[in-house]
């Protein structure tokens, strides 16, 4: 481990000890807000303190085993103990480095999934449908709930656009690296000459805003329209203008909801999406500014970035953000087996974050 990372760990361990002292102070215990804040921080630092303590014990075991190695009768046993201790120290070192990576506060959020057909006409819409189905299948494997917010079907299948809310523990942490342009190479069903076409679709993963998220929306900045729903809900949706479309005038962001029976419920859902969109826009602008000073490919979330190619004739899927990340398992991946891809992307992101921490003052 680099000295800079070790110093950060030592500082966090000292902070953990300080928090334990503070929480034992009767004055702090009587202050509900401070006690809650310190308790939360202590809980976040506890894994680091526990792992550091285990590392200290393992180093002591290693030193004892090295002392025994000088005894001819104990040498063989000592060599075994040394090997075990060294392997465990390597594991603990890796764990400590991972624990240094700041947790994304949005990781446990629900999310909005937006899939839109790009270049490629009807084939792009069909591919957008394939992607949405892929994410839906993955959500089913994770026991997450998928709620379609709105959709515009393609003329020959798939979707020109489909927006859904995904509800489940850790949903955003698993899918946040899916934002970007996805490209497909295959022979369309309508292609009589058997030629391979290239089409594209864009994916946006937007974390649902926390109820106490720090963003204010001026009602005067909103244009709210009602219209008759064309979505689910039976004949009722065609009788009343229950669907809601909200335009945020300063940014031009437009959201709508038509899946609920009441206008009030649709307005609440649309406002949640608008809030999430505006917060994500702020975060994206900040991330773009940071990217000007450092190269962080995996976690950029740039929707214009071409992130992945799905080559059906070769059964190949390539993620362009990670060197040599090509899997010849497209049939299973398109059916929702995304973990091999997601795990590699998370590992790459962790490596990038560790490199950034190592170079930080």
From Swiss-Prot:
InterPro entries: PCRF, Pep_chain_release_fac_I, Pep_chain_release_fac_I_sf, Prokaryotic/Mito_RF, RF-1. The keyword Cytoplasm applies. It comes from the Bacteria. Coiled coil: none annotated. Keywords: Cytoplasm, Methylation, Protein biosynthesis. Methylated by PrmC. Methylation increases the termination efficiency of RF1. Residues 283-306 are annotated as: Disordered. One of its GO terms (molecular function) is translation release factor activity, codon specific. Its main location: cytoplasm. The modification N5-methylglutamine is found at residue 235. GO terms for cellular component: cytoplasm. It is found in: Cytoplasm. Belongs to the prokaryotic/mitochondrial release factor family. NCBIfam families: prfA, PRK00591.1. Peptide chain release factor 1 directs the termination of translation in response to the peptide chain termination codons UAG and UAA. This is Peptide chain release factor 1.
């Amino acid at each position: 481990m680099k000295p800079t990372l070790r110093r950060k760990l030592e500082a966090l361990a000292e902070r953990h000890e300080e928090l334990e002292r503070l929480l034992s102070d009767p004055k702090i215990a009587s202050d509900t807000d401070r006690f809650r804040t310190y308790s939360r921080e202590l809980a976040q630092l506890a894994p680091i303190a526990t792992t550091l303590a285990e590392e200290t014990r393992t180093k002591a075991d290693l030193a004892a085993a090295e002392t025994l190695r000088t005894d001819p009768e104990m040498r063989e046993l000592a060599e075994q103990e040394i090997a075990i201790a060294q392997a465990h120290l390597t594991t603990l070192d890796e764990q400590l480095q991972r624990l240094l990576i700041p947790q994304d506060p949005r990781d446990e959020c629900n999310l909005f999934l937006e899939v839109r057909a790009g270049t490629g006409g009807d084939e792009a819409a069909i591919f957008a449908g394939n992607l949405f189905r892929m994410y839906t299948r993955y959500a089913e494997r994770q026991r997450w709930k998928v709620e379609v917010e709105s959709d515009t079907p393609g003329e020959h299948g798939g979707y020109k656009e489909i927006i859904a809310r995904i509800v489940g523990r850790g949903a955003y942490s698993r899918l946040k690296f899916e934002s970007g342009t996805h490209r497909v190479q295959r022979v369309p069903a309508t292609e009589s000459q058997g030629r391979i076409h290239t089409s594209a679709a864009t994916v946006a993963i937007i974390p649902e805003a926390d109820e106490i998220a720090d963003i204010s929306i001026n009602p005067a900045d909103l244009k709210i329209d009602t219209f008759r729903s064309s979505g689910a809900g039976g004949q009722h949706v065609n009788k009343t203008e229950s669907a809601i479309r909200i335009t945020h005038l300063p940014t031009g962001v437009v959201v709508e909801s038509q899946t609920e029976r009441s206008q009030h419920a649709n307005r609440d859902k649309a406002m949640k999406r608008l809030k999430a969109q505006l917060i994500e826009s702020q975060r994206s602008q900040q991330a773009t500014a940071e990217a000007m000073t450092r190269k962080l490919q995996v976690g950029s979330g740039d929707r214009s970035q071409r992130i992945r190619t799905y080559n059906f004739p070769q059964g190949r899927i390539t993620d362009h953000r990670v060197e040599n990340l090509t899997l010849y398992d497209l049939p299973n991946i398109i059916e929702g087996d995304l973990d091999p891809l997601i795990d590699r992307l998370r590992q790459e992101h962790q490596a990038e974050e560790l490199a950034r921490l190592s170079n930080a003052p």
